Design a protein with these regions (language model features):
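C-terminal catalytic "cap/lid" subdomain
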Residues: 1-257
Length: 257
């Protein structure tokens, strides 16, 4: 089974997104797509007169912004992808974590920063997701979950994909693929061909200490290594254009322990 997470920069590029959806639709066997939000929520919020607040690159999800991301991520972005996949013969079904109680979370506790209505995953409903897959459906998850009190929570898509992969890996072999706009983890951010083909915990720590791996790539890789340690067979980070090749092992960065 392949669980594929697609980033916001791909979602914001209509041509790149169309190409990705075609390649995803052609993956053999069971597959799940988890998508980020892109910049559409910021645009829609602006049109509605709602302020978008960010800190350290992360969105602050207050009550008005939660309404926006629910509409945009769970509605517009998700359903556009589902419609695109259906047109390609992929029997996709669009979901949030609230649908079928697929992903239960709790509201992130306030430490130094109050991120608002942001969720940390507690439980993945494996029987429900397995039922969909067994009936030939490909779930497409928006980055939204819910808590026991019925609140919708904005949820990091990288973490959501990792948690789904970890939960499903207890029953079968799972590949987790993070697709974004680069060819993989790069030694030189200015050189798209400087892909690190294999990354171990030792080389990861080395590259972090040398400043080669930094900023937003660190939480992505932390999620990747956590998934491998929890039983996911393979984690790959790649360009959305190289999805098929990455799954076959000939493109992107493969995470190993």
């Amino acid at each position: 089974m392949n669980i594929v997470k697609i980033g916001g920069n791909v979602i914001d590029d209509a041509e790149k997104l169309a190409g990705f959806l075609y390649r995803f639709s052609r993956l053999p066997g069971k597959k799940i797509l988890v998508h980020g939000g892109g910049k559409i929520a910021t645009r829609v919020a602006g049109e509605l007169g709602i302020e978008s607040r960010m800190t350290e690159g992360r969105r602050i999800t207050d009550a008005p912004m939660r309404d926006v991301v629910t509409m945009v991520y769970g509605g517009l972005v998700n359903k556009r992808m589902v419609a695109g996949l259906q047109s390609l013969g992929c029997n996709a079904i669009g979901l949030t974590g609230a649908d079928g109680a697929a992903i239960l979370s709790h509201k992130r506790p306030v430490k130094t920063i109050d991120y608002g209505y942001v969720g940390d995953v507690e439980k993945v409903n494996v029987p429900f997701i397995t039922l969909l897959l067994q009936n030939g459906l490909s779930p497409v998850f928006a980055p939204l979950t819910f808590d026991a009190g019925g609140d919708i929570l904005n949820t990091n898509a990288d973490t959501q994909a990792s948690e789904i992969a970890r939960a499903l890996s207890r029953g079968e072999a799972v590949n987790l693929v993070y697709c974004f706009e680069k060819k993989g983890v790069l030694k030189d951010a200015a050189d798209d061909d400087s892909v690190i083909s294999r990354l171990t915990p030792e080389t990861y720590e080395q590259y972090k200490s040398e400043g080669i791996i930094y900023d937003g790539m660190i939480p992505k890789l932390d999620n990747a290594f956590a998934a491998i340690r929890a039983g996911v067979r393979k984690v790959i980070i790649c360009d959305a254009d190289d999805l098929a090749e990455a799954v076959e092992g000939s493109a992107g960065t493969t995470i190993e322990i």
